[in-house]
Structure formats: C-alpha cells, structure tokens
Amino acid sequence: MSRWLAAAAVLSALVAPAPALAGVLDRYAPVVVHASGEPDALTSVRAFAGRVAGVEPGPARPVVYGRRAGRWLQYWMLFAASSQDRGLVRTGRHEGDWELVQLRLRGRRAVRAVYSQHAGAESCGYRFVRKSGGRPVVYLARGSHAAYFVPGLRDRTWPDPNDEADGRGLRVRPRLVRISAGRPPWIRYRGRWGATRAGWVPGEMSSPRGPTLQPDGHWSDPGGWAAAARPCTRLDCNRRGECDGRETALAGVLAALGLLWALLFGARRMRRAQATPANGGH
C-alpha cells in the first residue's frame, strides 16, 4: 500500500481533480465538528500518504471527497486512525478510517441526510438537520468518528464504550475534492488503508478498504444503504448532554432481566426433568 499511495500522491499532484465542484455538490459540503480531545482529526489522502516513510506529506488542510450518484450526494471523510476501544478486551483500534455523509436530492434541494455510525447509519429529514451557512453540520464522536446530527453522549450496548460527540473540538469547513469511479487515481486502489490486520482476539478490526469497496453498498447502491439506516428519533439532549442514555440504559436492564429469567426458567425445567422417572421404569 505504501508504494501505491506514494505513486498516487505524486500522480494526484500532477493530474489533480478540481478542488471544488461548483453548484449543488459544493453548496451542501458539510461543516465538520470534532469532539474535544480528538486524537485523529479529519485529514486528506495526501496527508495520510505522507505518514509513510520517504513520502512527502501533502497539505494539512482537511478535505471531504464528494461525488454525485444520481439523486444522492456523497461526502467521504478520511481519518488517519480509529482510536476507540471496543469489547471486553478493549480492542478495535485500527489505522485508517473512512466515514460517509450522504444527502438525498429532490431537484437541486436536499430533503434527507444519512450519517454513517459504526457498522450502521442514521437517517433524518434535512429540515431537522443543524446547519451553518446553509451547510449541514456533522458532529463526530471522539475516536470512532461516528457522525451525529446533534452533539451529546450516546449510550451504546455494553461492553462497547459510549460515543462522546460533545461538539467542543475542532470545527472545520473542509476543502471539497470531487471524486468518481476513476479519478483521482487513488480511488482505484483495492487494498486496505492502513497496516492493521485483525487477529484472533474478538473485536479486532483490520484497516478499511476505500470508498468504492466499502461494504453494504455505500458506493454502488446509495439508496439501499440509506434505506437500511435507522430513522432519527431524538434531536435534543438533556442538560448533562445525554441524548439517549436513559432509553438505552433501560433497554439494557430489561434485556439483562430477560436473560436472567430465561436462565432461571431453563434451570428449573432441567431439575424437573431430572426428578421425573423415565417412562416404564419400575
């Protein structure tokens, strides 16, 4: 990957795509708000390639990579690493991290937004999306870069950690670079964006592949990916910054009680079966 990215960085510098696409793609390019203490802020492909020994780093200014796919606008964001631990053994960190913000158009007007979050996504009517200068605002969770419509704390299923998207970190309006299935050259790279490889430990993750090879049809079927997203249900948070903590915590307690009941009921039936003589036995 290092050699390929090095070549792509040089070639991209010589045959660079337009830095911004006039019109609707540029108009809706998102404003990105990091969480406080974010160790790996939004970057660019050239800056990421610069992490490889012997390759000059590109501009430090963050970039979003935009494309129009039929009635959808896609904005891809690259981060040098995902640094949020997961699971009981606290694994899950990996080099390289791609995230996606997607907008549904009706004519030239955005009507729906879909933000990627871990292995899924959240969908919301565009009129409910917070905006800055007419652009959608994206709040990133610390370490994981899961994208949210409002800042706050999200309670995730134990043992995974909560998502902290407090909106108090770096706020940027990234430069927009247009991409397609063939340009710039790095879009054709079929390897992994990073050296991390998952081992046998549960929760370990390999570095991701690029936008065109993302799972769940992100690139090839934007509408299908959006249809699978969960609808946004709460766009406000309490004074402590908790956006869904109470509901999720209650669901976790109910699930634990249900599991305990199932175990006790199963043990009771087993004892009854052991105490009952077999048919025909005298």
For each feature predicted by the language model, list its residue ranges.
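Positively charged n-region of N-terminal signal peptides that target proteins for export
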Residues: 1-4
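Bacterial N-terminal signal peptides
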Residues: 6-16
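Generic hydrophobic/packing signal
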Residues: 13, 102, 121-122, 261
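Membrane-interface motif at the C-terminal end of an N-terminal transmembrane signal
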Residues: 18-20, 264-271
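A domain-level signal for the mature, folded cores of soluble proteins
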Residues: 20-99, 105, 109-250
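Selective detector of the "anchor" transmembrane alpha-helix that sits immediately C-terminal
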Residues: 247-268
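Cytoplasmic C-terminal tails of single-pass
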Residues: 272-282
